[in-house]
Structure formats: C-alpha cells, structure tokens
C-alpha cells in the first residue's frame, strides 16, 4: 500500500504538470512568470522518507505590488497532495505537517496563506473556476491575504514554521515575499528550502462514525424506495414513459449512487486506509460531478424546452440530447485536469477552454431556461385555445426550476461555505436538496401523464419515430 501514494502523485501531477521534479515544473513556467532572482529562493525540499518530492509543484511569478518598492516583492505558489504515510517507527500519535523555512541567503519577509481542498480533483475545478487563481495573485487578493495571514516568516525573527496537516487533501501555499538577495555559491538559489515531513494519522475511530453510517443507510433506503415507487407508477400508468420522466429517473438514480450509497459503502473503521479517500474522490468526480451533472442538465434542458410535455420530439432530437449529455460529461471530467497544464505552459487554448467551461457551468442552463420560456410563450399565443392547461403546468414547472436554480446559486452555496470543513454535514445538505428536487419534479410531471392518457401522442414510441396514428394538433412544430 505504500506504493499507492506514488501512483496517486503520478495521476495528480500528470494533469497539473508534466515535470517529474520541482526543477522540471519550474522549466515549464512561461518566461513572463519565471524569475531568476529572489523568487527562486522559495522552493521545495523533498523528504526522503516520505518520497514526496516528485509530486509537488512550485510556481514563482512577478507581483505588480513591487513596482515602487525598494525590495523585490514577488509571488509564489506551492501546491501538492498531502496524505498520511506510516512512519517507520510505528508512531501514529503525530499528524503530518509541512515545515517551511527561509534559506540562509535570504533576508526579508515571506507572507503566505494556506488553501485546502479535500480532493485534488475538486481543487482542479476551483483552479479553472477562478482562472488560475493559484498560479497568480492580483492586487485585491494580496490585500485580502495580508489581512488574514497564516504564516509570516521574518529572517530577523523566525526562519522556520511548521503547519500541522490534519486532513488529507490538496494544499496550496500562496503568497508573496519581500526579500533582499545576497551573493552566494553558484547553484544555491535553486536548492529547496521548504521541507515536507510525514507521520501517520491517529488511528482512533470517530465516535460518531456508526451514527453517520446509519444516517446514510437510511437515506439510501428511503430514496431508493421513493424512486422505485415512482418508476413503477410511471410504468403501470395508461401512458408510456415520457422523455422527461426517463431523464428524471436516470438523474436521480445516479444521484443516489453518488451521495448516500457512496458514503455508506466507503464509511470504514480504519481511517488510515489509503485507498478509500482516493476511491471516494474518483467516484465523486467521474460519476457524480461528471455523469450526474450531465444528466441533471439533460433533464432541465428537455423540461424547459417542453420536449415530451408541450411539444413533440423526434428520433434525431433524442440522439442530439444523448450526444449533448456525453459531451457535457466529457467536458466536466477532462477540462479541469487539462486546464492547469495549458495555463502553466502559457498556451492560448487555456483561455478558450475556460470560456467553454464558464459557459457550460454558469450560462448554459440560464440561457436554455430563457429560450424555453420565450418559445413556450410564443406557442401560448399561437395555440391559446388548445394550450391553457398545459401552459399553466409548464409555467409552474418553469417557476420551480428557476426557484431551484436560485437556491443552488445563493442559499445552498452559502450553506456550503458555512460548513465547508464539515464533509458529513455537506453530504447531508446535498442529499436533502436533491431529494426535494426529485419529489417536486415528480409531482409536477404527474399531471402531464394524465393529460396525455387518451391521445397517446407523447409516448416514448413517438420519441423513437413510431406513431400510432393519433396526433394532437396542439403539438405541431412551430
């Protein structure tokens, strides 16, 4: 199992940098960011026992705050995935820690803050969301950093500082330095000054672990029964499944797997097990953030555009939506892992990739919702005498979708920030939020099935191009 951290480091750093060492990572920094002076005085010293040197990344860059300063003020970033490595003497009472120290040939002050993410995959998403925030500091960010410093190393007072690392995850030390360079031996500037040392976690099992298991198991059973009851009810109804019903069921099935079922399966007695955090992280990233998000986006798209509810669709549209879902899942999984490499190498494609990412994450669903509302209102004016009931249902569904979007962007986002260090509470919030969505949408889709019980014009056979001769004039294309 001791080989596992090395395998994980290869995965993490293959997406963030192609270098196998700190020197290799610095060589890939664009010349506009590369500094050959004081910024090279902050680097990394791998701990031989931990074998951590080939999976850390140090990136220096020039800060615009040093234009009128008598001493050079340059920024630095230092990122890596810290995990627990069992010490040779078997002592498990000490947690891992990061020890940072100024070199002997440095006079000045280094100020920096610590950023932490439990999952390296999620950290990549934060990087692309913020446009490479961890590889650059602007004026506003530096001012905020100065007000809430974690560490301030002063060569006249203290050259060394140790930060305890109590949780596994992706750590970034981001800050700037005010140093005066001294003449020294050739090649000494490239020597590392930051030391990372490891000890295993305390193996005591949390008292609340059994209670958490019971809660996640209860969520899994209750949500599974709700989805099963709803699926049987739809299948046994007089009408066949509609497209939006299929999309809703697929999304909620993956939601159950990604949240309560995952948490129940991977809640183990031994928190020192290396494989579990990595499996949970991969499970959430590829299945949850990729497939689950794409399926939820597909459900919202088909609902707001009225396919299967207020208008007829076709075999080509089903194929188009399938390809769109695959494309979104691919983008969500791959883009955050490719973006750091493009950003560090100075490629112009990094900006294009981030624009596509921002559009898909923040603009796609609002634009689709607005387009669906415009088309439905146009259809309402055109088919006023035949569309009253369906229009009222669609308007209510659209209002609920907008309400849930507001909840996700404002209320739920603030709750996530409030409990950002409590992963269990965050999972509870996500599970409850997803369950409320499913119940609300399943209730709203019920009246549509009753409307189409007699003329089976919106059955799944129609979606596949198999018509039974019935045709609803209110569902003509417009």
UniProtKB/Swiss-Prot annotation:
Compartment list: Endoplasmic reticulum membrane; Golgi apparatus membrane
Any GO CC annotation of this UniProt entry: endoplasmic reticulum
Stretches of the chain found on the membrane's Lumenal side: 20-214, 262-289, 339-356, 413-427
Domain of life: Eukaryota
Signal peptide: 1-19
Keywords: Endoplasmic reticulum, Golgi apparatus, Membrane, Signal, Transmembrane, Transmembrane helix
Membrane topology: Multi-pass membrane protein
Residue ranges, Cytoplasmic side: 236-240, 311-317, 378-391, 449-478
Transmembrane segments: 215-235, 241-261, 290-310, 318-338, 357-377, 392-412, 428-448
The protein's name: Uncharacterized membrane protein C569.06
The organism of origin for this protein: Schizosaccharomyces pombe (strain 972 / ATCC 24843)
